[in-house]
Amino acid sequence: MARRGQQPPQQQQQAQPAQKNQAGKFNPAEFVKPGLTEEEVLEIKEAFDLFDTDGTQSIDPKELKAAMTSLGFEAKNQTIYQMISDLDTDGSGQIDFAEFLKLMTARISERDSKADIQKVFNLFDSERAGFITLKDLRKVAKELGETMDDSELQEMIDRADSDGDTQVTFEDFYNIMTKKTFA
């Protein structure tokens, strides 16, 4: 029982997940893998603990949506249920820490990948207009030593251009760069 002015022990644990980790009950080294440090594992564990609001050591769909939103990711209900379905290896309908870590490292990797694609886009968009034109593509082709005529370059733009304005926006470029197959 808690003394007057103190939280009950269970509430103290929930309010201080980092101390719980440092006390030896959680070993981040067990989850470290290439590209992921112990510090990053601890940060993700802290997020997990914060969003495991009922203290069950698992995150349900409602808790996952709040976690993803707070970490800056779009979290539509359909996406949340699909993530749980994809990651819930034990069929519980919830995500434990190992499953959460897998999800978050995939999302972090995706976010980093988008930043890398933005850098490549900026190389094409030399005037920083926010889109790639035939002129931009012609310049890059010339710099790379490619001998392509305007009709070939225009065909490339037409394939990437989703709204028919003869310009390739970053979203168009990103969609092409992340496509698994090309039609």
From Swiss-Prot:
Keywords: Calcium, Cytoplasm, Cytoskeleton, Metal-binding, Repeat. One of its GO terms (molecular function) is calcium ion binding. It is found in: Cytoplasm, Cytoskeleton. Ca(2+) 2 binds at residues 88, 90, 92, 94, 99. InterPro entries: CALM/Myosin/TropC-like, EF-hand-dom_pair, EF_Hand_1_Ca_BS, EF_hand_dom. Residues 39-74, 75-110, 112-147, 148-183 form the EF-hand domain. One of its GO terms (cellular component) is cytoplasm. The keyword Calcium applies. CDD domains: EFh. Residues 1-30 are annotated as: Disordered. It holds the Pfam family EF-hand_7. Gene3D superfamilies: EF-hand. Residues 1-19 have a biased composition (Low complexity). Ca(2+) 1 binds at residues 52, 54, 56, 58, 63. Monomer. Plays a fundamental role in microtubule organizing center structure and function. Component of the infraciliary lattice (ICL) and the ciliary basal bodies. Belongs to the centrin family. This is Caltractin ICL1f. The gene is Icl1f.
